[in-house]
Amino acid sequence: MVEMEQAEAQLSELDLLASMFPSENELIVNDQLALAELKDCIEKRTMEGRSSQVYFTINVSLDLSEAAVVTFSLSCILPFKYPTVLPEITVRSVSLSRSQQTQLNTDLIAYLQKNCLGDVCILNATEWVKEHAFDYVNIEALPSPARQSTAQPEDLAFTRLWIYSHHIYNKCKRRNILEWAKELSLTGFSMPGKPGVVCVEGPQSACEEFWSRLRKLNWKRILIRHREDIPLDGTAGGMEGQRKFPILEEKAFSVHGARGNHMDFGQLYQFLNARGCGDVFQMFFGVEGQ
């Protein structure tokens, strides 16, 4: 299978997945720039200029018992030669221990190697997880709904951090932002390019841990441009009610510039304004959005 056929197969599969998982939280394209590159290369009939692998997440909620609904997240990275080679898929769930998660992923890879090599297989992988997830979860160890609804005592404040960076290009840094936010149950968005913008929101302790990790990476310049701290009553409902973003995803707004690294700030402002954050635009850039 030649490069163009591989790229077209990837895009066709993404279109299929979008129709199978229409909800905003079911299919999340974590790397919008990579998807834009893929579409552009197919349109121009050349693979020149393609630098990033498509990266997305599928969230599947399963009723494993009358009292337990467990969410499994499939983080999927499509190598340039996929589907000739297998995708990189990692399944995660807060309901799995480390050993359970490792075993599930090992068994999934073995299934894909045996049955799907050479064909698109993300949907097959998702169906396999739906069918076999029960085998890896200890139902009795799952927290009760009452315990799930209560926040930890230290998370009595909701925090939203608006982080400014001179630029965000590095693929490892961009992946860290997405994976750390998911690990820490933070929502928001990340806008790569020059300048780079990251917004994370959630429990105060989680936001501070995210910032502690992020600032330790090698940056030309990075700082918290604006911070919001909101006291809560200690319930998860109060925490969730403060969120302005359903997930944390990477956003690309009409990429332009010689290196394709500048975003359309008008679209960024519209995105922020639609979520009640339009006033932050002036704090960031010193001009009113429009």
Curated annotation (Swiss-Prot):
Gene3D superfamilies assigned to the protein according to its UniProt record, in alphabetical order: Ubiquitin Conjugating Enzyme (3.10.110.10)
Record Pfam families: Prp3_C, RWD
Protein name: RWD domain-containing protein 2B
InterPro entries on file: Phi-like, Prp3_C, RWD_dom, UBQ-conjugating_enzyme/RWD
Domain RWD span(s) in chain numbering: 12-136
PANTHER family on file: RWD DOMAIN CONTAINING PROTEIN 2, RWD DOMAIN-CONTAINING PROTEIN 2B-RELATED
